[in-house]
């Protein structure tokens, strides 16, 4: 190879499966720096994520690290410490799902502690300490860089070391399948996106008009509703693992009509979901058992009631702080008939789901309210509205006092609540990230947006014209 050709030669490593957009670049030992820079820029423009190794290394970066992980995994299985399934499971639960970054985690634990742990392993297994304990001692510990507990930081600068450890939620969102070519109504999907809005994978597909979704953090399980054919009694409730396995029906066809938003009451191990044409709100155990109605808004055997959109329950949430459930009855499309109600989580003694004296209409005359969520620490109800301007296609909120009474505001003229974000395109899905003080909104126009709790700093994370997003959840 000529000297000129050597300067234009380098090593590349692409990844499988194809949705992993990472590519590793590594010098051949003679590669011109400008060639590396050129390729990095070009790869970014086509949606790849290039990573550059500073010097030649067998296995590039990722596979060299992966090789060491494989070795230790094989050791714990071969030594009889654990079986392969358990080793995989604990790795996923402690590293993959939380999004743990090794160097950030070491900073968090403390590099002096990390060195002591590695020293113990080295003594027990007769390992070389040149690139572990000795490296940490020389480059970090001896100069006072111990991680986030020291003002000099560690592998990360002190201002970012703690932030690097914090986990960002993964986004799970429903595509109802109605935005593209419609050959049938069972083209819905559940997709996963990163915190930054990058597509990760399709978790489940071939869903029958999926609408509401919730995540059980305790069990790493997705719950979602499939509306079925509008007006027919063929809606279903499903559950499935976050990893895309073990999909199973909780509520079979023939029981509910058109299930919409679904939420999880982890404290009581219950699911709540609305049933639009069923004219009610249901509650059941997380395995689908003990199904019961908690609110009934009309007679679903009566054609007039079933066609009356002012009786249609769509959004549902609850507050343990206030002991209340909240729901929307949306009214006709763009009809300014929408209402938001509340009632106690427990049906009063002697009353029924159809006849509850504790039911309160909080707001009425709304453009078209859809999904709900509740922020416990501020006692604030949030909802999406897909109605017309000026008050539709918005993100809204209503605050409550300690007794559960609504605190009406005049911050938006003619309204008793606040509009905090606007200009969505058929806003539907809603989820609050209380830890990071964010709100996520998904709309039928193909956008997934995030903003702060007050509606500021709104950003569009995802825009796909061929998607019609409904429910959104976080894990």
Swiss-Prot record:
What keywords are assigned to this protein? NAD, Oxidoreductase
User: Which biological process terms from the Gene Ontology are attached to this UniProt entry?
Assistant: fatty acid metabolic process
Is NAD a UniProt keyword of this protein?
yes
Q: Name one GO molecular function term.
A: oxidoreductase activity, acting on the CH-OH group of donors, NAD or NADP as acceptor
**Positions of NAD(+) binding:** 99-104, 245
Q: Does the keyword NAD apply?
A: yes
Pfam families attached here? 3HCDH
Null mutant phenotype: Significantly reduces the production of T-toxin and decreases the virulence to maize.
Known role: 3-hydroxyacyl-CoA dehydrogenase-like protein; part of the Tox1A locus, one of the 2 loci that mediate the biosynthesis of T-toxin, a family of linear polyketides 37 to 45 carbons in length, of which the major component is 41 carbons, and which leads to high virulence to maize. One of the PKSs (PKS1 or PKS2) could synthesize a precursor, used subsequently by the other PKS as starter unit, to add additional carbons.
Spell out the PANTHER family in the cross-references.
Answer: 3-HYDROXYACYL-COA DEHYDROGENASE (PTHR48075:SF3), 3-HYDROXYACYL-COA DEHYDROGENASE FAMILY PROTEIN (PTHR48075)
- The entry's protein name is 3-hydroxyacyl-CoA dehydrogenase-like protein LAM1
Q: Which organism is it from?
A: Cochliobolus heterostrophus (strain C4 / ATCC 48331 / race T) (Southern corn leaf blight fungus)
């Amino acid at each position: 190879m000529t000297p000129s050709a050597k300067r234009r030669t380098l090593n590349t490593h692409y990844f499988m499966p194809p949705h992993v957009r990472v590519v590793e670049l590594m010098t051949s030992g003679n590669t011109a720096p400008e060639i590396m820079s050129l390729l990095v820029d070009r790869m970014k423009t086509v949606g790849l994520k290039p990573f550059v190794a500073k010097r030649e290394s067998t296995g590039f970066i990722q596979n060299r690290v992966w090789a060491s992980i494989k070795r230790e995994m094989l050791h714990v299985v071969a030594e009889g410490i654990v079986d392969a399934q358990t080793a995989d499971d604990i790795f996923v639960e402690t590293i993959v799902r939380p999004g743990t970054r090794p160097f950030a985690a070491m900073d968090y634990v403390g590099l002096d502690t990390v060195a002591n742990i590695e020293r113990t392993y080295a003594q027990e297994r007769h390992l070389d300490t040149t690139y572990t304990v000795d490296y940490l001692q020389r480059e970090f510990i001896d100069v006072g860089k111990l991680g986030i507990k020291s003002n000099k930081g560690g592998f990360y600068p002190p201002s970012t070391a703690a932030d690097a450890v914090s986990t960002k939620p993964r986004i799970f969102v429903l595509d109802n399948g109605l935005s593209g070519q419609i050959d049938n109504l069972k083209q819905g999907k559940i997709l996963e996106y990163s915190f930054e809005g990058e597509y990760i994978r399709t978790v489940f597909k071939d869903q029958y008009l999926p609408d509401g979704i919730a995540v059980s953090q305790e069990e790493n399980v997705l719950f979602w509703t499939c509306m079925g054919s509008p007006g027919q009694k063929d809606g279903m409730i499903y559950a499935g693992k976050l990893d895309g396995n073990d999909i199973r029906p909780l509520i079979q066809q023939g029981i509910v009509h058109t299930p919409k938003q679904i939420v999880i009451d982890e404290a009581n191990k219950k699911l709540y979901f609305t049933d639009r044409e069923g004219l009610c709100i249901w509650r059941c155990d997380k395995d689908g058992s003990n199904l019961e109605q908690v609110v009934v808004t009309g007679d679903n055997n009566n054609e007039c009631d079933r066609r009356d959109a002012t009786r249609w329950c769509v959004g549902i949430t609850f507050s343990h702080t206030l002991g209340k459930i909240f729901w929307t009855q949306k009214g006709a499309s763009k009809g300014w008939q929408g209402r938001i109600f509340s009632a106690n989580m427990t049906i009063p003694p002697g009353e029924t789901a159809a006849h509850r004296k504790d039911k309160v209409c909080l707001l009425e005359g709304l453009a078209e309210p859809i999904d709900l969520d509740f922020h416990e620490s501020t006692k604030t109800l949030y909802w999406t509205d897909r109605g017309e301007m000026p008050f539709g296609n918005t993100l809204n909120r209503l605050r409550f006092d300690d007794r559960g009474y609504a605190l009406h505001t005049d911050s938006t003229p003619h309204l008793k609540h606040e509009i905090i974000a606007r200009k969505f395109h058929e806003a539907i899905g809603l989820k609050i990230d209380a830890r990071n003080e964010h709100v996520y909104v998904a709309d039928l126009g193909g956008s997934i947006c995030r903003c702060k709790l007050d509606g500021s700093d709104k950003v569009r994370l995802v825009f796909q014209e061929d998607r019609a997003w409904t429910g959104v959840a976080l894990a």
